[in-house]
Amino acid sequence: MQKKKKVDLVALQSPFMRIPQMPVAVARYLLDAGYTDIFQLQGRSAESLLEEIRKSSDLIPGADTLPALRLAIYFSENASNPDRSRLNLHAWQ
């Protein structure tokens, strides 16, 4: 019998999951850092968010965290008319 994988329903249901290709773990990191909505990321730098995440979480952020934060900031600042080519994690590597 296989173990069921633990699912983070709160992170999955958060507004951050409206961002295309947003990893669930990064949504969880943002929630743990005290952010509750996408608009709160406007004007922030990805590096400062990453530092806040490191301070607020016991987990070590993965390699996809910084590109995902850059994508989230871009989406928050351009939600009404984003460039589709930039709504991809690979565009932020």
Predicted segments, located by residue:
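C-terminal extensions
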Residues: 1-93
